């Protein structure tokens, strides 16, 4: 500041010195200064002048005053007035000299002023001299003034007036000039003042800026000082901490030393004791040996002769035994000879029987021919009679009316002729029908023979071991068979004779009518005769087949048949007798109907007959149910044969299956339930009308003969294609395998009731254990605090105790609370649970978040819920006698095992034979082998110190196993997560457990779960499991959690039957494949994320037929790199709604409903109802309040567990029995209302459709309202819409679906309408492996009869309705249905197309947005490329490449199996594929991405990636040209084996990439190694490499261009004529040039200025000089740019992908690279 002031002062003084101011100017300045001071007061107030300026101003003012005074003095001087003009000049000179002496400071200025005055005067004088005549007259103003001045002086000389006038004039002129000068000077002064003010302001501003900068710097310095101070403080604090830690460590070290000293002392003492004991043992052993030897010597002397006698007796016995064996062998040989003779006799008898059978067949054929001849004769007689009648009519009409009635006669002749033609046509049709019926009968007989053969084969296998049948019984049986055959023949002949007589009588009766009636009867009667003849032949065929079944089976069976004839013949006789009786009844009924129903329609007659036959078969269901399994297997095998040979066997198999209606009646339930091949599909494409008519087979029955005729004619016309069979057969085989699994499980399961009874009957041995007593320092619970919690006066009245956050307490005061029911002590510092033995009514204990180490809660029988989470427990002991515990939570403890712990109750037996009780012990020294009754095995049991240290013999009398859970007989929920479990063997003592959580432990295997038959939820995530737990007996399992384990295979799933399993999570494991999951019929959620699943084709097989799967997670698996993985999975899984966390908009509800109806729908309904009941139970009882528990909630929880136990046991028994029926209140009411429930969904839909058809009728008692409510509750629609929806579904499934599926089927079949009989047989089939009681069997049979009666009544009613409805418009409803269906299909297709278009547009917009976003981020990153991030330099020695080692150890893989089908190891991660190499569809909006590379890339080579060219901006300046000729030459470079291997291994399309890899690997060797190699060796390697790349020369084609470093070889035209030496020299030059031009810019270093069109991409010289190599794309990561790897349907895809990078996977393989990347890139 002082320097600035001094500078200002100096400048002001310099400016003031330059100024020259006169006295007048000073006056003006003063006047102006006054005015300016008044106007500039505001300025002066704001800006104060410095002192120096003020001082100068004052000096100027003083000088101006002095000048004025001097001037006035001169004017007043008298001498001057009297003197002349010259005197004045003298005075002036004098004044000048005077002033100069007085005022030396401003003398120069005064001299200047005076000189100017003189000049003016001189000029005036000149003017006066020039005009001497002119005398200025005094003005009138002057004269009076002069007069006035000098009035009295008359003598005064007035010469001064002139002078005065002149002076005045000169003064005025001077004044004017001075004014002008003053104005100019003022202007200059003003401008100068303005400039100075501006400079002053600028300097002030600079000063203020300097001040601000000073303050800022001051603050910075202060902040730096503070930071340094903070750092110093932190360092001091850290040093203090370090010193404290070191001090603590030192203290701990000292403690450890003390402990080690103590341990060494104890060890020394123990060693001394052991030495003493060893000495004692040696002495004892020596004594024992001596005693043993002495005792052995005494015993040998005493018992030697006895032993010798025993040895001799043994030898004698052995010899006797040998003699007996020889006798036995002789007897066996005799028996063998006798059996051979018997077999020879039997063979002779068989031959005789064969001859008899052939003879009978001949007789049968002869009889058949006779019957045909008789029938032909009857037909010929009828024709003759018809012709005679017609001729008689003509004769009579011509005789009576010859003339007048000619026209009428002609008309009658035409009518008669027409009748004759109609009769002929009917006869021809009947003959055709008869032939068809014969074919049908033959096939049916063959089918029955096969069935009988299989039944006899089965029975013969069972009776093979019975060899005690005598020959007499066999002969008697043969005689009885012959008699039965003869009787059957006689009966057949008699029946034929009777029927012929009846037909003759009917003919005679019909001839008595009118002529018109006779014609009608003769037209209709042959039809009836043909029907009756066909039925007769059918009966005859049945008789003959039944007679010959035994003979045919004897040919097949051979020797075993004779052994088993007794049993088989008895059963066959019973079956034959029953069949004959029933056939006779049917024949009688048919004859009566033929006599009484001649004028009825032919369809109704066959319907009645068929209904009666089916009713008879339903009554005979008990006799035939044993053959059901064989029939099922036979049909299944036939379906397979048809699948293999569809063209050859289509017609034959169709007839066989069609004609086995009688044998298939017992299996129809299963076929209808599973939508099996039989009865599900139509025969061929052209049977649309027939399919429509037979679509409602369950309510309609058509004529048998018409159906056979239609099938036979139309199937010959339209033969189906063989490839169309695969779909239906695959579905059928799938459903058959599911049912097979269910039946196999029913055979092999462990009955849960037996396990439960064994557990209940197991004796619990209680022993006293040492219990840790609480410390005396902790206080007991205060009685007053307990009583304040409720309205209680004494502790005996207390029922609930709740405390939280107590410092520490003991529960001794609770011993007086005898009525305590609810105890909650959270965070109360408890160390043990004790003193509760008197609280017998205690139900609920909540002691979470304490420090409990021991439990003492024995004999609390009412205890239900125990919550001990977050404590310090190490075992499960202390709950003995608490038999009613239902929920036990022990998470976050230190429990190590649920396994068995043993304790021995030992007794010693001394030498005298006395027994001494030693007590129990758990410490052991050695082992002894003991039989364990619980495990049914021998095991090594420890011997304790009590027995080991004794000198006597020992005896383990009782061995007790204890696991801590054996007394918990009703435990249902056990939670043991976050413990230290290594063993779970004790779970076998808890068969009632329903919920088990053992997650986050150290388990390698889960044992004891086999007995937990009611287990529904199993959580095992976070363990070390390598295999699946054994789940064979867990049929009720609903959730299985196996996340974060080491499971590598799930093949055990294929052997498990888990029909209720809904949720499976196996994420974060090492799975490379899964088994097919179709048999998990209720599976809804599957999580297999973060595994090693890579094969999409096998994944499609795994998920095939999982129709209930709604949610699937596959994130983190390599198969997501496939292009079409999403579409292929959605095709296989129609019901999928959530895929990898994204909600799908699927239009597959109709498909899922159809698939839900597939299979054993009754069983599916059972599973769904059970799951629904479990969920409803949870909703009703679990309030969802979280951790808030009260006494009411505890009681509610106990009720929930009781209900859960009842439901679980009931459903378990249902699965074990194989019962498929759903028992509900609504269904019981439905049974009362005469509508019994069936097994399948189709019957329910039939009922709903039937009810909807009868909506208009007011009285419909067959369908109750509650049943309709139950049906509508299962569907998401309202009750009013159920009828329409179910009707549409029913029509689509039963009417239209058959037409569509007829293309995929070549087996013409017909369904049997009686489905309730089927249900009874399916129930019997499910019970085949269980032996039910007599009451259950009786109930089942009664129900079957009752339901059969109901269904027969309903079918009669439905047939009436159907006939009434189909007479008028037979095909109108069917056409309407087909039209409606086509319209629906078109609408669905249009809607799907619109939705697909909309989805494509949305995806395109979304992907464009994401791409733009990524490009902006990439461009920003390019701008900020030069960041402060430091990369570690790469050691290029890591890239050393050994070609020989690569050739030796290279794995030659099949290119077809790479990369999707080759399975990696479990510890390897799958690298993401480059989408540019994959085949992607035009429909997929995917952008290919290229990986970041260390070398510079070529722009034209990577045209497919526009982003890559932007990312690598450096490559634009240094890339080489790429010509199409080089592309064609690259395609022919496949000769090198190494390049082929690399291209096959890595999947490269272009061989150039493999060459680049090899050359780059060779070039990236370190310089040190290159220096070590000799130049000749390097030259040889170079030649070898050149020879590998060289191409064969073709004479016709131009030599292809080589893009390498040695292009000059091809360009040189003299290359062909050069010798070998010149070639070597040239190669050396090129190698020298290559070695020297590898590093650096080629344009500058190349000697020949060659073209740098290099074969490989160039390495950056900066990289070779030690610069940084960017091996990872730092702009956008590859996972983000690869749009194929994640779905764009959700906006959170990018965030999810970024979260994946930070997600830690426990089993993921770490990277082996040495590079370090900054945090921004990761």
From Swiss-Prot:
Location of the region described as Disordered in the Swiss-Prot/TrEMBL record: 23-47, 182-202, 265-285, 319-367, 1506-1534
One BP annotation, GO: regulation of signal transduction
Domain LRRCT as annotated: residue spans: 1117-1157
InterPro entries found in the cross-reference section: IQ_motif_EF-hand-BS, Leu-rich_rpt, Leu-rich_rpt_typical-subtyp, LRR_dom_sf, P-loop_NTPase, SDS22/Internalin_LRR
Residue ranges of LRR repeats: 819-840, 841-861, 862-883, 884-905, 970-991, 992-1013, 1014-1035, 1036-1057, 1060-1081, 1082-1103
Alphabetic keyword roster: Leucine-rich repeat, Repeat
Domain of life the protein comes from: Eukaryota
Domain annotation IQ: ranges: 283-312, 1335-1364, 1395-1424
A GO CC term attached to the entry: microtubule cytoskeleton
Protein name per UniProt: Leucine-rich repeat- and IQ domain-containing protein 1
Organism encoding this protein: Homo sapiens (Human)
């Amino acid at each position: 500041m002082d320097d600035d002031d001094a500078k200002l002062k100096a400048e002001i003084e310099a400016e003031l010195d330059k100024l020259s101011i006169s006295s007048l100017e000073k006056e003006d300045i003063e006047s102006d200064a006054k005015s300016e001071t008044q106007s500039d007061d505001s300025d002066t107030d704001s800006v104060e002048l410095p002192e120096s300026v003020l001082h100068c101003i004052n000096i100027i003012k003083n000088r101006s005053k002095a000048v004025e005074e001097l001037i006035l003095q001169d004017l007043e001087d008298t001498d001057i007035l009297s003197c002349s003009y010259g005197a004045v000049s003298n005075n002036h000179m004098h004044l000048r000299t005077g002033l100069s002496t007085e005022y030396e400071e401003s003398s120069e200025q005064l001299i200047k002023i005076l000189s100017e005055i003189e000049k003016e005067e001189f000029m005036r004088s000149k003017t006066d001299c020039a005009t001497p005549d002119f005398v200025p007259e005094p003005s009138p103003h002057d004269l009076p003034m002069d007069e006035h001045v000098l009035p009295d002086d008359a003598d005064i000389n007035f010469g001064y007036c002139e002078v005065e006038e002149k002076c005045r004039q000169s003064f005025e002129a001077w004044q004017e000039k001075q004014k002008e000068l003053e104005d100019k000077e003022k202007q200059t002064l003003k401008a100068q003042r303005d400039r100075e003010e501006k400079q002053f302001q600028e300097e002030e501003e600079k000063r203020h800026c300097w001040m601000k900068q000073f303050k800022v710097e001051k603050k910075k310095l202060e902040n730096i000082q503070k930071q340094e101070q903070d750092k110093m403080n932190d360092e001091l604090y850290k040093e203090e901490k370090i010193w404290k830690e070191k001090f603590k460590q030192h203290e701990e070290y000292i403690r450890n030393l003390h402990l080690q000293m103590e341990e060494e002392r104890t060890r020394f003492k123990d060693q001394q004791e052991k030495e003493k004991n060893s000495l004692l043992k040696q002495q004892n052993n020596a004594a024992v040996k001596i005693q043993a030897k002495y005792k052995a010597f005494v015993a040998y002397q005493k018992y030697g002769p006895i032993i010798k006698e025993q040895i001799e007796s043994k030898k004698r016995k052995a010899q006797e035994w040998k003699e007996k064996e020889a006798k036995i062998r002789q007897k066996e040989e005799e028996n063998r000879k006798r059996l051979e003779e018997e077999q020879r006799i039997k063979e002779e008898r068989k031959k005789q029987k064969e001859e008899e059978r052939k003879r009978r067949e001949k007789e049968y054929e002869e009889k058949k021919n006779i019957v045909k001849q008789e029938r032909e004769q009857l037909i010929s007689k009828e024709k003759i009679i018809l012709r005679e009648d017609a001729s008689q009519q003509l004769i009579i009409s011509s005789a009576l009316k010859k003339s007048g009635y000619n026209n009428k006669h002609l008309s009658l002749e035409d009518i008669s002729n027409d009748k004759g033609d109609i009769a002929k046509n009917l006869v021809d049709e009947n003959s055709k029908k008869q032939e068809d019926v014969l074919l049908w009968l033959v096939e049916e007989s063959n089918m029955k023979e096969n069935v009988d053969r299989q039944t006899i084969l089965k029975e013969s296998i069972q009776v093979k071991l019975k060899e005690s049948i005598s020959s007499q019984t066999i002969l008697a049986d043969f005689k009885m068979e012959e008699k039965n055959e003869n009787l059957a023949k006689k009966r057949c002949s008699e029946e034929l004779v009777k029927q012929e007589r009846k037909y003759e009588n009917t003919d005679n009766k019909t001839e008595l009518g009118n002529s018109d009636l006779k014609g009608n009867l003769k037209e209709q009667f042959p039809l009836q005769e043909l029907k009756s003849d066909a039925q007769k032949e059918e009966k005859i065929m049945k008789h003959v087949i039944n007679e010959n079944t035994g003979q045919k089976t004897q040919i097949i069976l051979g020797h075993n048949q004779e052994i088993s004839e007794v049993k088989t013949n008895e059963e066959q006789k019973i079956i034959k007798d029953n069949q004959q009786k029933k056939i006779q009844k049917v024949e009688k009924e048919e004859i009566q109907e033929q006599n009484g129903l001649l004028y009825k329609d032919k369809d109704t007659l066959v319907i009645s007959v068929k209904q009666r036959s089916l009713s008879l078969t339903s009554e005979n269901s008990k006799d035939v149910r044993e053959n059901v399994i064989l029939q099922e297997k036979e049909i299944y095998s036939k379906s397979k044969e048809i699948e293999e040979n569809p063209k050859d066997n289509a017609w034959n198999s169709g007839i066989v299956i069609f004609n086995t209606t009688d044998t298939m009646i017992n299996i129809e339930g299963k076929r209808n339930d599973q939508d099996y091949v039989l009865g599900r599909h139509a025969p061929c494409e052209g049977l649309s009308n027939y399919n429509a008519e037979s679509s409602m087979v369950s309510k309609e029955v058509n004529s048998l003969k018409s159906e056979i005729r239609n099938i036979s004619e139309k199937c010959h016309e339209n033969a189906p294609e063989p490839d169309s069979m695969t779909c239906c057969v695959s579905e059928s085989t799938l459903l058959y395998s599911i049912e097979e699994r269910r039946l196999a499980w029913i055979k092999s399961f462990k009955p849960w009731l037996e396990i439960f009874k064994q557990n209940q009957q197991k004796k619990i041995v209680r022993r006293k254990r040492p219990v840790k007593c609480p410390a005396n320092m902790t206080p007991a619970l205060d009685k007053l605090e307990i009583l304040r919690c409720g309205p209680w006066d004494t502790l005996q009245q207390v029922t609930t105790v709740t405390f939280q956050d107590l410092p520490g307490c003991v529960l001794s005061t609770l011993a007086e609370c005898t009525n305590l029911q609810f105890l909650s002590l959270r965070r109360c510092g408890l160390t043990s649970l004790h003193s509760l033995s008197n609280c017998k009514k205690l139900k609920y204990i909540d002691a979470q978040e304490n420090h409990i180490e021991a439990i003492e809660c024995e004999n609390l029988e009412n205890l239900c819920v125990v919550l001990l989470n977050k404590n310090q427990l190490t075992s499960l002991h202390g709950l003995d006698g608490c038999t009613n515990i239902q929920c036990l939570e022990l998470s976050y403890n230190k429990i190590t095992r649920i396994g068995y712990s043993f304790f021995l109750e030992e007794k010693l037996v001394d030498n005298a034979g006395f027994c001494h009780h030693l007590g129990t012990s758990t410490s052991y020294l050695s082992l002894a082998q003991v039989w364990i009754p619980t495990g049914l095995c021998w095991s090594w049991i420890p011997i304790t110190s009590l027995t080991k240290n004794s000198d006597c013999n020992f005896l383990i009398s009782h061995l007790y196993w204890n696991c801590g859970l054996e007394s918990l007989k009703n435990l249902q929920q056990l939670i043991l997560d976050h413990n230290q479990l290594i063993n779970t063997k004790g779970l076998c003592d808890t068969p009632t457990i329903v919920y088990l959580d053992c997650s986050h432990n150290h388990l390698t295997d889960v044992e004891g779960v086999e007995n937990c038959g009611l287990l529904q939820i199993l959580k095992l995530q976070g363990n070390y499991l390598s295999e699946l737990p054994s789940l064979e007996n867990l049929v009720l399992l609903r959730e299985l959690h196996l996340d974060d384990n080491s499971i590598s295979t799930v093949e055990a799933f294929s052997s498990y039957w888990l029909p209720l399993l809904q949720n499976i999570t196996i994420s974060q494991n090492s799975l490379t494949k899964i088994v097919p999951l179709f048999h998990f019929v209720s599976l809804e959620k599957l999580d297999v994320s973060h595994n090693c699943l890579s094969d999409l084709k096998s994944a499609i097989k795994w998920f095939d037929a999982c129709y209930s799967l709604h949610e699937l997670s596959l994130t983190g698996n390599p198969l997501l790199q496939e292009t079409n993985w999403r579409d292929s999975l959605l095709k296989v899984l129609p019901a999928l709604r959530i895929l990898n966390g994204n909600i799908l908009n699927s239009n597959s509800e109709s498909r899922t409903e159809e698939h839900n109806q597939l299979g054993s729908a009754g069983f599916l309904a059972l599973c769904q109802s059970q799951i629904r009941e479990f969920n409803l139970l949870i909703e009703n009882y679990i309030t969802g309040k979280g951790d808030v528990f009260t006494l009411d909630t505890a009681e509610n929880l106990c009720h929930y567990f009781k209900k859960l136990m009842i439901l679980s046991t009931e459903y378990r028994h249902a699965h074990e029995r194989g019962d498929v029926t759903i028992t509900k209140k609504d269904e019981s009411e439905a049974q009362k209302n005469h509508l019994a429930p069936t097994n399948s969904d189709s019957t329910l839909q039939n009922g709903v459709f039937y009810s909807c058809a009868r909506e208009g009728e007011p009285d419909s008692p067959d369908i109750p309202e509650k049943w309709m409510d139950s049906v509508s509750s299962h569907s998401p629609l309202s009750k009013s819409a159920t009828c329409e929806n179910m009707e549409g579904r029913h029509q689509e499934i039963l009417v239209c679906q058959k037409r569509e599926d007829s293309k995929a089927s070549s087996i013409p079949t017909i369904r049997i309408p009686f489905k309730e009989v089927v249900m009874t047989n399916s129930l019997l089939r499910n019970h085949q492996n269980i032996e039910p009681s007599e009451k259950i069997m009786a109930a089942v049979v009664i129900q079957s009869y009752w339901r059969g009666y109901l269904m027969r009544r309903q079918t009669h009613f439905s047939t009436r309705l159907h006939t009434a409805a189909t007479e008028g418009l037979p095909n109108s409803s069917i056409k309407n249905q087909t039209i409606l269906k086509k319209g629906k299909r078109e609408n669905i297709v249009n809607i799907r197309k619109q939705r697909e278009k909309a989805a494509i547009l949305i995806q395109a917009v979304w992907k464009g947005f994401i791409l733009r976003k990524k490009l902006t981020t990439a461009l920003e990153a390019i701008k900020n490329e030069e960041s402060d991030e430091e990369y570690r330099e790469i050691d290029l020695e890591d890239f050393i490449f050994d070609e020989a080692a690569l050739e030796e150890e290279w794995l030659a893989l099949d290119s077809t199996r790479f990369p999707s089908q080759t399975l990696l190891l479990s510890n390897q991660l799958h690298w993401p594929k480059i989408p540019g190499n994959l085949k992607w569809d035009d429909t997929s909006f995917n952008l290919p991405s290229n990986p970041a590379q260390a070398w510079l890339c070529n722009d034209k080579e990577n045209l497919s990636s526009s982003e890559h060219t932007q990312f690598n901006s450096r490559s634009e300046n240094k890339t080489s040209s790429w010509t199409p000729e080089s592309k064609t030459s690259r395609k022919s470079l496949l000769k090198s084996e190494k390049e082929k291997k690399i291209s096959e291994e890595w999947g490269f399309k272009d061989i150039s990439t493999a060459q680049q890899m090899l050359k780059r690997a060779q070039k990236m060797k370190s310089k040190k190694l290159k220096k070590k190699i000799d130049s000749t060796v390097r030259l040889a390697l170079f030649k070898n490499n050149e020879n590998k790349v060289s191409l064969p020369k073709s004479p016709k084609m131009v030599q292809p261009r080589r893009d390498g470093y040695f292009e000059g070889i091809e360009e040189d035209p003299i290359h062909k004529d050069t010798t070998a030496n010149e070639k070597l020299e040239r190669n050396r030059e090129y190698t020298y040039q290559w070695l020297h031009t590898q590093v650096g810019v080629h344009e500058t270093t190349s000697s020949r200025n060659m073209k740098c069109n290099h074969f490989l991409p160039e390495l950056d010289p900066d990289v070779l000089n030690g610069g940084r190599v960017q091996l990872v794309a730092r702009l956008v990561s590859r996972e983000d740019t690869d749009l194929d790897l994640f779905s764009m349907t959700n906006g959170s895809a990018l965030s999810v992908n970024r979260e994946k990078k930070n997600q830690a996977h426990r089993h993921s393989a770490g990277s082996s690279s040495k590079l370090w990347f900054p945090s921004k890139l990761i």
